[in-house]
């Protein structure tokens, strides 16, 4: 009854105009399923156009009248509750749902029963150090390992389909990842199973106090990957690459302040990042983004953002990089805190959803207007992003100061439904599409 009460009525089916320019920024009051936004590099405001504001939300218990909103033709229901701040969720090939409970140091396995509700709930592994990313290796229907990205390492467990408990102790694959600061580490494998990609966020906001690189700037730039940082930010604000056994470590891409969510795009095989950009430049800078990540590319942080826009806090520091910044594919409302992402490959949603991406927006703290706290759909056309994104699930915000949910993870279940975790009240929600 509770789940039915909280399951939302679908939003209207009429087409919404695309919000562009300053209209695309807005706040939570403009959010509803079907609202489409397009933020372009030329729409950016100047740094300091508004003052930087600390405005964290207060997480409250889920109100009895709370209703999540989804597009017409969809339904959303409670899938699991009572979890310990669930973060990243990943569906195993057999249909089991693996959940990272980062604060608790555990990875949990959920198995659905009749009616799509959780019937089995077991701790797969415990004693982990802030686990976040989860990946099954090798890709395909018969993985032999479950990899877990801790905040300071990557470990793996031997696995057979249907395991509810780890069948062996954690084997360390990568013994040392940069620790502290932005602590989430996500993990994916390339389609050919040859490389393991791990995202590592920055230690700081904009590399404050990084100083001068060893040997001087000119020598550093000649010998290191494009845009590589050093000292306290060494191998940070980056995606790292390894062999599946942890060897042949290298930097895959740089300048990505905090790639919280990693996913492989099925059509291209390219990794994508869901990224938290920097704070402190005002309400409407800098847009978060979701983007494909090309090997060897530099995405700007900390010296530049969204092309060659220089961060005033690093004025004149790296003129050699100004024209070498890769522009992200899809810009998101600033300070939305874009976290987990996935690509839709299921058989349940309408055909126009095939290949589109979903990303969880955890919600703002550095904006005077409450922003985020929703799940968005990122539109693709022939495997390429249009630059537009639309609100897909809204309703986590109670008022200007309070929220009851903060979306973190998204995953496509074996039956084609979309699962969404939120760590405010420890729940996972399931979006289904009506038969067509």
Where are these regions (language model features)?
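Beta-propeller domain segments
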Residues: 17-71, 143, 184, 202-250, ...
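Asp-box/WD-like beta-propeller blade repeats and closely related beta-sheet repeat scaffolds
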Residues: 120-121, 130-131, 135-137, 144, ...
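Surface loop/turn motifs at the tips and blade-to-blade linkers of beta-strand repeat domains
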Residues: 78-83, 123-129, 173-179, 251-255, ...
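Blade-loop segments of beta-propeller domains
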Residues: 82-87, 106-139
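Beta-rich catalytic cores
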Residues: 75, 85, 93, 103, ...
